[in-house]
């Protein structure tokens, strides 16, 4: 079965460990640990790039599957499941599917188009560490793509492998030299036609690689032929572009608006002008 995978901005993974209320940024303890942190590498399929050219879909394209996970924010998640299951399959990652089913039915949500996955995790921020999907070939052969998560949270980092195993999909991991890439989903958007967007955090977090090498990895694993990188914002600690912008279609970018001269507003405007002036 073919899945088009969409990862929500807020996705919660519950599994074999007790979830921690870790923030989106690194804690002081994590910052100290990260200096000597060695990320996990689960070579379940291939740490080489896909063997044929791939295309990463845009978020506005039709989807066949959406991942949510069940630990907190359950009232909101129930609403998401209720609406999404009318349109496509919902993958619910949880520790106890029976309790999830009970909660859904108690809110009047029918148990249709649902799949349940068990996977451990460290934090709530699966938009940042979850799987990415890419396609190759005339038959749209789906592949899962995995990077190194930019947090010292090894269980989070293994969630893409858990999904790939469940869905019986090949996974290609940019986790081993020379293709090892530290990245985060919240700092990556794509237009479906080969153009990718990130803040320059992607360069800062890969100091052993040149920008050209980073572009090459993104091309090999994600099919990105034009990689636009914008300056980070002075007041946004995590520097994820999904905090202030979204691609709506091939020709439209939605950005956050501040009062004139306030906070991150001037840098957002400067970034927008940089894109408009250089990448038509």
Describe the role of every protein-language-model region.
Residues 1-21:
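Bacterial Sec-dependent N-terminal signal peptides
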Residues 20-280:
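The feature marks the mature, well-folded catalytic cores of soluble enzymes
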């Amino acid at each position: 079965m073919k899945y088009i995978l969409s990862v929500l901005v807020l996705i919660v993974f519950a599994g074999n460990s007790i979830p921690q209320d870790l923030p989106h940024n690194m804690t002081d303890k994590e910052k100290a640990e990260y200096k000597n942190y060695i990320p996990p590498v689960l070579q379940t399929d291939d740490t080489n790039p896909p063997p044929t050219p791939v295309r990463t879909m845009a978020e506005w394209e039709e989807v066949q599957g959406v991942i949510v996970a069940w630990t907190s924010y359950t009232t909101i998640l129930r609403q998401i499941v209720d609406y999404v299951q009318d349109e496509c399959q919902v993958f619910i990652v949880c520790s106890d599917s029976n309790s999830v089913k009970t909660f859904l039915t108690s809110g009047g949500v029918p148990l249709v188009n649902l799949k349940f996955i068990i996977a451990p995790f460290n934090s709530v921020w699966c938009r940042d560490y979850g799987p990415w999907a890419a396609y190759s070939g005339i038959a749209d052969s789906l592949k899962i793509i995995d990077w190194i998560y930019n947090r010292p949270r090894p269980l989070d980092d293994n969630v893409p492998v858990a999904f790939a195993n469940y869905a019986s999909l090949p996974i290609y991991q940019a986790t081993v030299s020379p293709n090892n890439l530290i990245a985060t989903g919240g700092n990556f958007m794509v237009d479906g036609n080969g153009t990718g967007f990130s803040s320059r955090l992607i360069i800062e977090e890969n100091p052993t690689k040149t920008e050209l090498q980073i572009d090459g990895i993104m091309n090999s694993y994600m099919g990105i032929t034009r990689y636009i990188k914008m300056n980070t914002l002075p007041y946004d600690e995590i520097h994820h572009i999904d905090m202030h912008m979204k691609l709506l279609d091939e020709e439209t970018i939605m950005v956050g608006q501040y009062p004139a001269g306030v906070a991150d507003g001037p840098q957002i405007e400067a970034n927008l002008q940089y894109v408009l002036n250089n990448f038509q």
